[in-house]
Amino acid sequence: MLDRVVVLLSVLCLGVSSQPIPNNQHLFSMAVSRIHHLHLRAQRLFANFESSLQSDDQRQLNKIFLQDFCNSDYIISPIDKHETQRSSVLKLLLISKQLVESWEISSHFLPGGLAERSQISSRLAELREGIQMLITTNQEGAEVFSDSSTLPLAPPFGNFFQTQGGDELQRRSYELLACFKKDMHKVETYLTVAKCRLSTEANCTL
């Protein structure tokens, strides 16, 4: 009886130890899936907010937003798809992490219900942790220093989230949702390109 128990435990231990440890591609797949979900949610929130506006208000807010900028624009990132493709995997990861971090607090001010905002904040925190794991597994001394040293932290939001009324609140809400959608699109692009670089896929063009 004892011999049978020992054999059974040995088989169970062997089964556990043979389970594959998540590799880069698995971690990247999880990160890309999470950011894709966040990007879709950002698009939906923005579309819902726009649909609640009058046509004239939409045009006016869009015109104002084009002349304005997002707080995260202080984070230096590739200016176009060509620069994105030339950037190292680590640099894309570092930028993605900063963009995600810049929304962990500000996501609490997104228009919508408390449950929605809470879910978004939780997803952002999970994504940041996943990206940090990828940075740790992909960093290589000199590259870390050269890439991370060029990425300044975004400054505080100041009075961006101060309670406003009327048209000002509407404008701030529009800008916040537009910036959130824009940044989630950036992160999804960067993580997708970085994932492709480390795979066997020959074509990583955008």
From Swiss-Prot:
SUPFAM superfamilies: 4-helical cytokines. CDD domains: somatotropin_like (cd10285). Zn(2+) binds at H37, E188. The keyword Transmembrane helix does not apply. Keywords: Disulfide bond, Hormone, Metal-binding, Pyrrolidone carboxylic acid, Secreted, Signal, Zinc. It is found in: Secreted. The modification Pyrrolidone carboxylic acid is found at Q19. Residues 1-18 form the signal peptide. Pfam families: Hormone_1. Disulfide bonds join C70-C179, C196-C204. InterPro entries: 4_helix_cytokine-like_core, Somatotropin, Somatotropin/Prolactin, Somatotropin_CS. One of its GO terms (biological process) is positive regulation of receptor signaling pathway via JAK-STAT. GO terms for molecular function: growth hormone activity; growth hormone receptor binding; metal ion binding. It comes from the Eukaryota. The keyword Zinc applies. One of its GO terms (cellular component) is extracellular space. Its main location: secreted. Growth hormone plays an important role in growth control and is involved in the regulation of several anabolic processes. Implicated as an osmoregulatory substance important for seawater adaptation. Belongs to the somatotropin/prolactin family. This is Somatotropin.
